[in-house]
Amino acid sequence: MNNVHELQFLKEKIQELKNDGVYRKLPILEGPNEAEIMLNGKKVINLSSNNYLGFANHPQIKKAAIDAVEKYGVGAGAVRTIVGNMDIHEELERVLAEFKREEAVMVFQSGFNCNAGTIQAVTEKGDLIISDQLNHASIIDGARLSRADKTVFKHADMDNLEQVLKENQDKYRNKLIITDGVFSMDGDIAPLPDIVELAEKYGAMTYVDDAHGSGVLGENGRGTVDHFGLHGRVDFTIGTLSKAIGVIGGYVAGSHTMKEWLSHRGRPLLFSTSLPPAAVGSIIEAVKLLMSTTEYTDRLWDNAKYFKEKISQLGFDIGHSGTPITPVIIGEEGKAMAFSKKLLENGVFVSGIIFPTVAKGTGRVRCMVTAGHTKEQLDRAVEVFKKVGQEMDLL
């Protein structure tokens, strides 16, 4: 009889991962997350980071973190509903509401927590959640926590969405349509105006997870809702503070009613300590910086367009991305992972993405160009893509 403490069942599952070629070890960075990094002791060009604007190591933002620690200490010490709600947390929510051009904002400890806490808080038995089939895992998990019924519509397929809405028009008290603003694996933008039109036509609420749109799309990076001019017509907008903003945390933007309800029923808010002052102070500075200039978003888009053009000219399939996210689609899963490995051996770190994260036969490496990259770095990366692509007969 096996010793239960040896966790033999997990050892067997781990071996299955190794047999399938999808076992991985956590890469170790030796320094800040920038355009070039020290990874496992080797200097490489970084094309895997969500640090879109280069804010994660921005000197002005780092100083704001240090100043906040000096004034407030290193931790909040409690959940916000008890004694963990400092005036700096309130200031952050005011700044974010101004940035997102919404009535109110509720900050959570992560973007994942936003979806885990909000979806279950605003839906219940007798409601229907209608989710794009390619939505982020945190949306899927958040929906699972709700007692509402769930269904999906084909990715960005408005005819299918309308069919689902028609079929369920009179069956539920409330309906909630959920979509990513920008889909992280392909970089495509949700057809949000059409979704909102259908939601209003059939009396449904709209919920947008804008993790990869905030700081990227819209005026000064205000996001997908701003990009399409849909303020006041989207009920819940989720934003992350760990990607373009460069720190940690997430938020829900919407009405005062939304915020009031989540302060009573948002479980991650109620049962987990609030963000530490250093994070809050640095986020405030980052958002103010973003509102004050388009320098960083302009540089991001300039770099993204430059890289896409160069990679496409080599003959790689980069899909139909409408954002800086640039998938280089290889196809067969094993080749995609081998391509990623060879790129790293040649000084470029870019993540291999395979099933079940993407559909079978669409294995890829996902390139994340940032405002922090120089043209020289991007040129070097393109040369490595060309070299490895030719060696593997991909070009």
UniProtKB/Swiss-Prot annotation:
Which GO molecular function annotation, any one, does this entry have? 8-amino-7-oxononanoate synthase activity
CDD domains according to UniProt: KBL_like
Residues reported to bind substrate: R24, H136, T357
State which Enzyme Commission number(s) the record gives.
Answer: 2.3.1.47
Cofactor(s) annotated in UniProt: pyridoxal 5'-phosphate
Question: Any idea what this protein is called?
Answer: 8-amino-7-oxononanoate synthase
- For the ligand (pyridoxal 5'-phosphate), the binding residues are G111, F112, S184, D209, D210, A211, H212, T240, L241, S242, K243
NCBIfam families, per the entry: bioF (TIGR00858), gly_Cac_T_rel (TIGR01825), PRK06939.1 (NF005394)
UniProt keyword Cell cycle present: no
